[in-house]
């Protein structure tokens, strides 16, 4: 029980800015087991956002609330996944060789492509969430972060790392397939509880397709995956899910 709590708190500490004033074991096995809690952490973040939405919806217009939710997400996650998207776009769109792309992705300075990608990402999320709220589908606020993290886990089934060292190497190729599939079943069951089965199947299939296509792009560009590409995959997964949800 103690090890389970350790791994759960480790995921909160690693993926959020929620203060965990506790010394935790952080070996590779802890991250491997802790991956089970990644969608749980996402649902906690989404749940907090949903509570903010419920608390403000009678006082502020939906568009203002969505902006505040995006700000809250950036603060609670430290912009971790959006930063990965920006770095990935800076590198991939530079049209350089693998080594130079990875150097660009490691650069803390944001380039033009990263800036454009982040702006488009935020605009898309804003418009999609706003439109879904108007359609009385505010539950998407909770579901989208969960699906995004599921896409990360599927990407981590690959053992192809683009760098010898990096934070992403903790997860890439070190995930348990049975755990990932169990998490997926639980996430799909949760989705089906709130959405029609048809919508769940179509949206999740679309996310898997986008995840696989992105994986092929990563192989083509840098012959593997990095922590930045995992973050980018999360953002792509969330956007894809929200798009399909709005279309349905």
UniProtKB/Swiss-Prot annotation:
Enzyme Commission numbers on file: 2.7.8.26
Cofactor(s) required for function per UniProt: Mg(2+)
Broad EC category: transferase
Main location: membrane
Signal peptide, first to last residue: none
Keyword terms: Cell membrane, Cobalamin biosynthesis, Magnesium, Membrane, Transferase, Transmembrane, Transmembrane helix
Membrane topology per record: Multi-pass membrane protein
Recorded GO CC terms: plasma membrane
Localization terms from the record: Cell membrane
Annotated catalysed reactions: alpha-ribazole + adenosylcob(III)inamide-GDP = adenosylcob(III)alamin + GMP + H(+); alpha-ribazole 5'-phosphate + adenosylcob(III)inamide-GDP = adenosylcob(III)alamin 5'-phosphate + GMP + H(+)
UniProt pathway annotation: Cofactor biosynthesis; adenosylcobalamin biosynthesis; adenosylcobalamin from cob(II)yrinate a,c-diamide: step 7/7
A molecular-function term among this protein's GO annotations: cobalamin 5'-phosphate synthase activity
Keyword ATP-binding: no
Biological processes per GO annotation: cobalamin biosynthetic process
Positions of transmembrane segments: 36-56, 59-79, 113-133, 137-157, 170-190, 199-219
Function per UniProt: Joins adenosylcobinamide-GDP and alpha-ribazole to generate adenosylcobalamin (Ado-cobalamin). Also synthesizes adenosylcobalamin 5'-phosphate from adenosylcobinamide-GDP and alpha-ribazole 5'-phosphate.
Matching NCBIfam families: cobS
Family: Belongs to the CobS family.
Protein name: Adenosylcobinamide-GDP ribazoletransferase
Species the sequence originates in: Clostridium botulinum (strain 657 / Type Ba4)
Gene symbol of the encoding locus: cobS
